[in-house]
């Protein structure tokens, strides 16, 4: 606030940081950060934790590091607070086509829907070699890789992968109602079958059921 009062024209003021106006603008500065983050990850040869980035790029806030990662097509999340880059991936066309085919098969069986756990379990079942080649050890890892590879083919919001345009707002509640065919009434048993099939967590399914009860009322023990 004091700097803005005395030097209103010398800096570009943002909520968490400022940039001197006689150097590159935010976009160009972010591009340089992108490249530096990418080079750092390549040098490490593995996904890196947010704290490693903050140690390497001292003085940068979380938002200053996250913005370039989200904006750069070569950078992506790996899991909670971990980030990776395209250069570390080992996918050939056969791998990409196989992963796409698995997603499509799951969606064909579930009206255009696939969860990260459904996808991961299916790749394990098919003994896909790209899991080991890319050190993919969890549904979250695979979700972010799929998001990176197919961001323009499907809609992603973890843990959900959906056919483009099916949902205006991707949420477990909307997906559950869609898979239940937007019924006037439904039973807890029907809902539980959806939860089990989609491999949603107990916490998620409980929260969604609570939200659904705001729009539906109980008329029996199971409905």
What are the functions of these language-model segments?
Residues 1-223:
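C-terminal non-catalytic scaffold/interaction domains in large multidomain proteins
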